[in-house]
């Protein structure tokens, strides 16, 4: 009887979506803190060819999706979905920015000059070309992390309690707000303030629904303001 009751309780929790994953309480999305000082417009980055520094204030008034990417990850096919997302929501003000990093499983080992050819001919392959801006490879966690990632992470709670296997994570020191893996995402609103953060395994289709919902709320607020 006890075993039956336990199974029944477990099933109820599972159907309610409250059973913690084995790796520890992942959330598909977290909402960012409201009271952080500063905006993303105080920062910028070099394009992947190293030829242009782009200040993020160039994207003022847009919805900016920051994604740390890698060419040899099990999630690399998200590039295809990100291209589709950029094409679909670009006309409504979405700008996707990609930041290669080799800190998770050493899955971005090449030089900057090798990343685009790898995407085109290996993974995803088939002549793939990203339709969104990629920037130079760099650190998103640790002592040498890019400063705008410090800002994003401090603005938004992490999506998982655990960092993962230390043998596959290549940075020090490790902090609670650190990015957990390749293809974690942050949305910054038209005012330059971080809005949402997504777990790396959250599907791009779910990310799209969250962004659309936020866009609708912003449009409604603007309409009331008029």
From Swiss-Prot:
InterPro entries: Glutathione_peroxidase, GPX_AS, GPX_CS, Thioredoxin-like_sf. One of its GO terms (biological process) is response to oxidative stress. GO terms for cellular component: extracellular space. Its EC number is 1.11.1.9. Residues 1-24 form the signal peptide. The keyword Membrane does not apply. Secreted in plasma. One of its GO terms (molecular function) is glutathione peroxidase activity. It is found in: Secreted. The active site is at residue 73. Belongs to the glutathione peroxidase family. Homotetramer. This is Glutathione peroxidase 3. It comes from Mus musculus.
């Amino acid at each position: 009887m006890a075993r039956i009751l336990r199974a029944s309780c477990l099933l109820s929790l599972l159907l309610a979506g409250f059973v913690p994953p084995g790796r520890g309480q992942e959330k598909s999305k977290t909402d960012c803190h409201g009271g952080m000082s500063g905006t993303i417009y105080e920062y910028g980055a070099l394009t992947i060819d190293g030829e242009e520094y782009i200040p993020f204030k160039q994207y003022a008034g847009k919805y900016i999706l920051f994604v740390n990417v890698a060419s040899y990850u099990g999630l690399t096919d998200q590039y295809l979905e990100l291209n589709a997302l950029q094409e679909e929501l670009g006309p409504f003000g979405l700008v996707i920015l990609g930041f290669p990093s080799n800190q998770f499983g050493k899955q971005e080992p090449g030089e900057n000059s090798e990343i685009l050819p790898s995407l085109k001919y290996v993974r995803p392959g088939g002549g793939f070309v990203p339709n969104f801006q990629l920037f130079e490879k760099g650190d998103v966690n640790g002592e040498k992390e890019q400063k705008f990632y410090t800002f994003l992470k401090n603005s938004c709670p992490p999506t998982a309690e655990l960092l993962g296997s230390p043998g596959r994570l290549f940075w020090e020191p490790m902090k609670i707000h650190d990015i957990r893996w390749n293809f974690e995402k942050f949305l910054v609103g038209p005012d330059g303030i971080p809005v949402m953060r997504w777990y790396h395994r959250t599907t791009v289709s779910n990310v799209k629904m969250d962004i659309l919902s936020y866009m609708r709320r912003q449009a409604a607020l603007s309409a009331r303001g008029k």
